[in-house]
């Protein structure tokens, strides 16, 4: 790093593994760092893959004003992202083991009810019953699996506690959690992925960044809007849509009248549940931008409107 020119330089890199760390290091030395999305750089790399062609491709991509750089993430953002990634991995492991146990026991005529809370207590009760029909050779192994499942559940709970503790230090998270359908996971994921919503000129641009706006197919006087683009971070989009589904369910079953929920229920009656959930997620993304940029809560903004 000492070989980087002393006068402030512009350093262009692909936003790949460890790029954010090096970006922070270079910024501390007074340099301007530009991280480019690898998928946007690839079309500019011609011929064989060498350091020279990679560098040439990155420079050509950097000169294209239509390619938006990736902001350098802070340590706090990467910490939140790492906790979310660990939680997602443990959730996937738990789901795989739960399904495996239910499938194995079904082969012996034992049906475990659907739902994570039912599996471990039910399996342990069966293991204590000598006449349950579980082969003796499987009993110790299934007991170990139950222990593993409890361990995974403990890790998931611990990560969520860590996220809650970090959220207490971030005023932005508290404001975002005032929005319907945005809880701890979604709010902290937004901070981890986006960093600062003020880099987007409008809520519509922010919703497009998350991939919740429709694709456009235009030719001449013909203009058709298709399915959502699904650009951007798939995990963040999933959280927003799941939160919208929960909000929609509450609006229908718990009668929580307000303009946002009433609008979502009307859309569901016209277009169906899935489209209504995605439409609500799109609207929530725009509200997220408004709450974030105005540094106010959803309730205060709604009353001001």
Question: Language-model segments: which ranges?
Answer:
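Short helix-capping/linker segments at secondary-structure and domain boundaries
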Residues: 65-68, 97-98, 156-159, 195-199, ...
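Phosphate-backbone recognition surface of nucleic-acid-processing proteins
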Residues: 44, 175-184, 189-273
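Conserved phosphate/pyrophosphate-binding and hydrolysis machinery centered on Walker-type P-loop NTPases
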Residues: 73-76, 109, 113-117, 139-146, ...
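Glycine-rich, often acidic, oxyanion-interacting loops/wings at catalytic, nucleic-acid
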Residues: 84-175, 255, 297
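Short alpha-helical scaffolding segments that buttress acidic/His motifs in well-ordered protein cores
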Residues: 61-62, 80, 142, 190, ...
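Low-complexity, acidic/Ser/Thr- and charged residue-rich accessory regions of DNA metabolism proteins
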Residues: 221, 252, 259-305
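Phosphate- and other anionic-substrate recognition elements at nucleic-acid/protein interfaces
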Residues: 1-131, 214, 248
């Amino acid at each position: 790093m000492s070989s980087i020119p002393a006068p402030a330089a512009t350093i262009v890199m692909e936003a790949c593994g460890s790029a954010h760390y090096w970006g922070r290091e270079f910024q501390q030395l007074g340099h301007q760092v530009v991280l480019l999305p690898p998928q946007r750089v690839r079309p500019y790399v011609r011929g064989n893959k060498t350091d020279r062609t990679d560098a040439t491709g990155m420079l050509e991509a950097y000169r294209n004003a239509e390619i938006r750089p990736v902001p350098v993430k802070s340590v706090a953002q990467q910490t939140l992202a790492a906790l979310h990634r660990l939680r997602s991995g443990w959730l996937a492991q738990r789901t795989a083991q739960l399904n495996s146990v239910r499938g194995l026991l079904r082969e012996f005529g034992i049906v475990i009810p659907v739902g994570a809370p039912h599996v471990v207590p039910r399996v342990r009760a069966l293991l204590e019953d000598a006449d349950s029909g579980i082969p003796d050779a499987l009993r110790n192994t299934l007991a170990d699996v139950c222990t593993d499942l409890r361990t995974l559940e403990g890790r998931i709970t611990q990560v969520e506690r860590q996220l809650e503790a970090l959220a207490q230090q971030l005023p932005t998270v508290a404001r975002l959690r005032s929005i319907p359908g945005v809880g701890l996971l979604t709010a902290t994921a937004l901070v981890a992925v986006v960093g600062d919503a003020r880099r987007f000129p409008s809520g519509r641009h922010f919703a497009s960044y998350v991939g919740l706006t429709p694709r456009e197919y235009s030719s001449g006087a013909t203009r058709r809007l298709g399915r959502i683009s699904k650009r951007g971070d798939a995990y963040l989009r999933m959280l927003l849509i799941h939160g919208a589904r929960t909000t929609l369910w509450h609006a229908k079953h718990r009668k929580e009248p307000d303009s946002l929920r009433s609008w979502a229920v009307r859309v569901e009656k016209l277009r169906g549940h899935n489209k209504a959930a995605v439409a609500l997620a799109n609207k929530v993304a725009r509200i997220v931008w408004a709450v974030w940029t105005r540094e106010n809560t959803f309730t205060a903004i709604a009353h001001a409107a």
